[in-house]
Amino acid sequence: TAMVDCSDYPKPACTLEYMPFCGSDSKTYSNKCNFCNAVVDSNGTLTLSHFGKC
């Protein structure tokens, strides 16, 4: 399983940088910030499926 360090999150705003992450919920997150904010919101239930689009 790929690991992402989300210890610096959540952040109030994310950049528009596009570097997609595929979450365990089968959703594509546009970048690490958006993905990590979602991980924090999910209380750790969301994980990274793989890098790139789902």
Swiss-Prot record:
It is found in: Secreted. GO terms for cellular component: extracellular region. Pfam families: Kazal_1. PROSITE patterns: KAZAL_1, KAZAL_2. The keyword Disulfide bond applies. Its main location: secreted. Glycans are attached at residue 43. GO terms for molecular function: serine-type endopeptidase inhibitor activity. Residues 4-54 form the Kazal-like domain. It comes from the Eukaryota. The record marks 16-17 as: Reactive bond 3. InterPro entries: Bifunctional_prot_inhibitor, Kazal_dom, Kazal_dom_sf, Prot_inh_Kazal-m. Avian ovomucoid consists of three homologous, tandem Kazal family inhibitory domains. This is Ovomucoid.
